[in-house]
């Protein structure tokens, strides 16, 4: 399924940074928590209630090129309903338009990978005919997401909707609820300390005086240290995330050379790996095919050093200059990307039944997602610069790739584990590999 099994690169960061961080034991697991509040609380970020579907004005419809789930209750209802006359291909009932795919009942897409109920005005034929109540749970809730913990429920929005990206782009910084404060009142310290860890990471990634990359590298290093020196306590978290510890850690990391060419080469592979199945199914071709062709071209040029060393050296020099220019043009979007990453931390880092290993795995996936998205920006920027002498990155282009790549990487937890286990020598990465794809 994932053909490239890459060897992790070893880097000697741990010995150089370890002196910056004191080691104490820690523990944390939600799965053994039996505390239940008398009244379930719904905790939401500050942006959640501001979302509105823009329907026919949406530039990247959610009714095309991905699986649209149909729950059992909806499917039973659809067996008794006829398709509106405006649906091009008439079948005996609405359920007849569904298929089983990867163990899930979904709407069967047409030859253009579009939902058969989507009309030319990008409106749903079912809603026009029957109203919103006819829709499946997926269509009703997207892009909303809910996680149900034993102690409370959390709601958030997913980034694979352009209207969500527009919402985040208008806010300088997103604000998330402090769940640990709520849980500390219940006396459930094992659970609250994991949520406190998440809050510490959210705060770390909210410091605009430093780069996203620096903060991701520090975050993953701290997570690895905590994982290796369990059990987890509130006091230990305060120590690891203290201003002095983070400053010393940042100084140590900044002294390490992380060659951009290695990053570009590895991110080329990552992006191609993630795209394999989508290419086979003919999905997102307009978005993916141009940048994947350039990724392949870059990979071939970088691997051609033995036959044409002078040409390769010149190519590498030009590529480095382009990367440096790109990072400058990307910097105006750092607030948006920071909002995106912090939302990923809030929504995906800590799931029901999580422990510290799960948190590490989820952080790796978030990093892989970010590295692939950023690399898709880079490749598209190179193509646009070649085609039209464009230097700046347009917001519409950035939004397009952010939406499509997050749709591509929106795996369920079991699928994330399968992908990482099939693609890497070990489920848990060395810090060096994390640093390789993130850079500094």
Where are these regions (language model features)?
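Hydrophobic, aromatic-lined core segments that form the binding pocket/scaffold
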Residues: 212-440
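N-terminal cysteine/histidine-rich coordination modules
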Residues: 34-122, 126-136, 140-179
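Serine residues within intrinsically disordered or low-complexity segments
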Residues: 19-20, 29, 33
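Charged, amphipathic alpha-helical linkers/stalks
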Residues: 163-247
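Conserved aromatic-histidine-acidic binding/catalytic patches
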Residues: 66, 127-131, 149, 186-189, ...
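Single conserved hydrophobic/aromatic residue that forms the stacking wall/gate
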Residues: 1-16
């Amino acid at each position: 399924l994932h053909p490239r099994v890459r060897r992790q690169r070893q880097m000697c960061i741990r010995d150089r940074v370890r002196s910056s961080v004191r080691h104490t034991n820690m523990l944390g697991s939600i799965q053994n928590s039996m505390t239940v509040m008398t009244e379930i609380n719904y905790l939401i970020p500050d942006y959640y209630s501001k979302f509105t579907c823009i329907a026919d004005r949406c530039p990247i419809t959610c009714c095309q090129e991905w699986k649209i789930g149909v729950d059992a209750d909806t499917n039973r209802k659809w067996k008794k309903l006829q398709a509106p006359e405006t649906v091009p291909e008439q079948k005996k009932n609405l359920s007849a338009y569904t298929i089983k795919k990867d163990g899930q009942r979904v709407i069967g897409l047409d030859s253009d990978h579009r939902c058969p109920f989507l009309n030319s005005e990008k409106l749903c034929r079912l809603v026009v005919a029957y109203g919103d109540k006819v829709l499946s749970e997926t269509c009703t809730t997207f892009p909303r997401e809910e996680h149900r913990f034993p102690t409370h429920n959390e709601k958030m929005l997913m980034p694979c909707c352009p209207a969500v990206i527009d919402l985040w782009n208008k806010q300088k910084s997103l604000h998330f609820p402090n769940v640990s404060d709520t849980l500390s009142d219940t006396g459930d310290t094992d659970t609250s300390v994991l949520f406190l860890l998440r809050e510490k990471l959210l705060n770390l990634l909210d410091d605009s005086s430093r780069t996203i990359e620096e903060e991701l590298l520090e975050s993953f290093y701290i997570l690895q240290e905590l994982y290796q020196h369990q059990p987890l306590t509130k006091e230990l978290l305060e120590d690891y995330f203290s201003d002095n510890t983070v400053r010393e850690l940042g100084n140590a990391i900044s002294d390490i050379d992380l060659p951009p060419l290695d990053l570009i080469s590895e991110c080329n592979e990552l992006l191609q790996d993630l795209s394999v199945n989508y290419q086979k199914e003919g999905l997102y071709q307009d978005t993916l095919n141009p940048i994947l062709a350039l990724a392949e071209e870059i990979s071939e040029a970088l691997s051609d050093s033995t036959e044409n060393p002078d040409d390769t050296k010149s190519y590498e020099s030009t590529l480095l200059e382009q990367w440096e220019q790109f990072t400058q043009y990307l910097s105006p979007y750092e607030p948006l990307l920071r909002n995106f990453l912090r939302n990923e931390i809030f929504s995906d880092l800590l799931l029901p039944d999580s422990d510290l290993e799960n948190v590490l795995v989820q952080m790796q996936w978030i990093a892989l997602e970010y590295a692939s998205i950023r690399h898709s920006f880079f490749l598209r920027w190179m193509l646009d610069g070649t085609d039209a002498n464009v230097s700046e990155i347009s917001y519409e282009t950035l939004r397009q790739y952010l939406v499509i790549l997050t749709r591509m990487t929106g795996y369920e937890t079991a699928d994330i584990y399968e992908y990482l286990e099939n693609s890497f020598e070990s489920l848990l990465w060395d810090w060096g590999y994390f640093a390789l794809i993130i850079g500094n």
